[in-house]
C-alpha cells in the first residue's frame, strides 16, 4: 500500500514537473529546464526504487528491457540533435554541446553493453537504465547552465534546438516510467 502511495505521489510530482511556460524568455527557459531535469531525475529514481520490490519480476524485466530500447533510441536522437545544434553554436556553448554529446554517447554505450542478457542481469540493466536517464538529465542541466552563463555568445537558434531535444527526451523518459510502473503494479 505504501509503495502504491509513493508511486502515486511520484506520478503527481512528475505531472507537476512537466508544466512548461511557453512564453518564458530564454534565461527563464534554461532555469526551468534545470529545475525540471532535477525534478524528473528525483521522480525517476524514486519510482525505480519503489518497483524494485515488485512481485511481477518477469513483467518488470520485460518492461525494463523494452524501456532500455526506447532510452537507447532517444539517446541517439538527443545526441543527433546536439550534433546539429553544434553548427549553430559558438564559443563556450559549442564546447558545452560537444562535451554533452560525448557524455551522452558514452552513457548510451554503457547501456548497450548491459542490454543483451536481460533475464540474467535484470537488476544491473535496471540500474543502468536509471543511470542513463539520470546522466542524460544531468548533462542537460550542465548544458543549460553553460548556455545561460554564456548567453551573449549563444545564438538564438540554439535554445529552441536544446529545448526540443530535451522535451523529446522527457516524453520518452515519462513513457519509460509509466511502462515500468504499469508492469510493476500489474495484478
From Swiss-Prot:
Species whose genome carries this gene: Hyphantria cunea (Fall webworm moth)
Protein name (record): Apolipophorin-3
One GO CC term on file: extracellular region
Keyword Transport attached: yes
Secretion signal span: 1-17
Family in the record: Belongs to the insect apolipophorin-3 family.
InterPro entries: ApoLp-III (IPR010009)
Tissue: Hemolymph.
GO BP term, pick one: lipid transport
Propiece span(s): 18-22
One Pfam family of this chain: ApoLp-III
Keywords, comma-separated and alphabetical: Cleavage on pair of basic residues, Lipid transport, Secreted, Signal, Transport
Subcellular localization(s) per the UniProt record: Secreted
Stated role: Assists in the loading of diacylglycerol, generated from triacylglycerol stores in the fat body through the action of adipokinetic hormone, into lipophorin, the hemolymph lipoprotein. It increases the lipid carrying capacity of lipophorin by covering the expanding hydrophobic surface resulting from diacylglycerol uptake. It thus plays a critical role in the transport of lipids during flight in several species of insects.
Family annotation (Gene3D superfamilies): Apolipoprotein
Subunit and partners: Equilibrium between a soluble monomer and a bound lipoprotein form. Apolipophorin-3 associates with lipophorin during lipid loading until each particle contains 9 or 14 molecules of apolipophorin-3.
Main location: secreted
MF-aspect GO terms: lipid binding
Amino acid at each position: 500500500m505504501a509503495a502504491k502511495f509513493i508511486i502515486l505521489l511520484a506520478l503527481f510530482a512528475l505531472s507537476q514537473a512537466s508544466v512548461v511556460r511557453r512564453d518564458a524568455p530564454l534565461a527563464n527557459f534554461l532555469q526551468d529546464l534545470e529545475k525540471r531535469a532535477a525534478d524528473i531525475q528525483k521522480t525517476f529514481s524514486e519510482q525505480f526504487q519503489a518497483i524494485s520490490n515488485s512481485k511481477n519480476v518477469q513483467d518488470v524485466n520485460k518492461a525494463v528491457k523494452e524501456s532500455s530500447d526506447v532510452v537507447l533510441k532517444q539517446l541517439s536522437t538527443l545526441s543527433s540533435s546536439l550534433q546539429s545544434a553544434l553548427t549553430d553554436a559558438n564559443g563556450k556553448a559549442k564546447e558545452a554541446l560537444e562535451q554533452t554529446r560525448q557524455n551522452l554517447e558514452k552513457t548510451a554505450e554503457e547501456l548497450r553493453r548491459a542490454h543483451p542478457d536481460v533475464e540474467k542481469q535484470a537488476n544491473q540493466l535496471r540500474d543502468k537504465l536509471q543511470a542513463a536517464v539520470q546522466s542524460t538529465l544531468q548533462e542537460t542541466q550542465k548544458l543549460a547552465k553553460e548556455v545561460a552563463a554564456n548567453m551573449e555568445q549563444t545564438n538564438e537558434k540554439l535554445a529552441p534546438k536544446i529545448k526540443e531535444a530535451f522535451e523529446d527526451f522527457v516524453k520518452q523518459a515519462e513513457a519509460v516510467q509509466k511502462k515500468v510502473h504499469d508492469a510493476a503494479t500489474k495484478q
